[in-house]
From Swiss-Prot:
This is PXMP2/4 family protein 4. It holds the Pfam family Mpv17_PMP22. The lineage of its organism: Eukaryota, Amoebozoa, Evosea, Eumycetozoa, Dictyostelia. PANTHER family: PEROXISOMAL MEMBRANE PROTEIN 2 (PTHR11266:SF80), PEROXISOMAL MEMBRANE PROTEIN 2, PXMP2 MPV17 (PTHR11266). The keyword Membrane applies.
Length: 185
């Protein structure tokens, strides 16, 4: 057991070191990995319900690419922007940040998600527009139910260097929801 704890402590130390040295790259890799996990969880559930279905590795890789290329970098810079304009670690500033996030970033992020996934899937512009019409609003409304509480905790209690990591861990469930929404026809 002590070897496991030592190994975990070393992994944590290495991760924190990389987070300080290469914040955007570390957050991008973390996001990509956790998006891969999210989609794998969804597919695992789908496979348990439909024995004829096969694991879609390309689908999981598209999720990972989106997490890596968009989610990690976007939220690194977005949270920096919010911290610059609302620097106090107070409940008031946490509430302001989460409100701005829900009104500005969340709708844009959900648009980017469905558009980006459509592009990665090789869909036509018309197909992407149809997907947005079908699922964007439902996803945004769900986002408004789930993320305000998480973001309040994030902005009020989590240090700025760890905000994207915290969001990514919470995002495992949300990423699974997004994967399910994106795979629905």
């Amino acid at each position: 057991m002590s070897r496991l704890l030592v190994g975990l402590k070393l992994a944590q130390s290495h991760y924190l070191s990389q987070l300080h040295k290469y914040p955007v790259a570390t957050k991008a890799v973390t996001s990509g990995f956790l998006y891969l996990i999210s989609d794998s969880l969804v597919q695992g559930i789908e496979l348990s319900r439909d024995k004829d279905k096969k694991y879609d590795f390309k689908r999981s890789m598209r999720m990972a690419v989106f997490g890596f290329a968009v989610t990690g970098p976007l939220f690194h810079y977005w949270f920096k922007y919010l911290d610059k304009h609302f620097p106090k670690k107070s409940y008031r500033h946490a509430f302001i940040k989460l409100t701005i996030d829900q009104v500005v970033c969340s709708p844009v992020f959900n648009f980017l998600f469905f558009s980006g996934m459509g592009i990665l899937e090789g869909k036509s512009k018309d197909d992407i527009v149809e997907k947005l019409k079908k699922d964007w609003l439902t996803t945004y409304v769900s986002d408004c139910v789930v993320w305000p509480f998480i973001n309040f905790v994030n902005f009020a209690y989590i240090s700025s260097i760890h905000r994207v990591t915290f969001m990514n861990v919470c995002n495992i469930g949300w990423g699974a929801f997004l994967a399910k929404m994106n795979s629905s026809h």
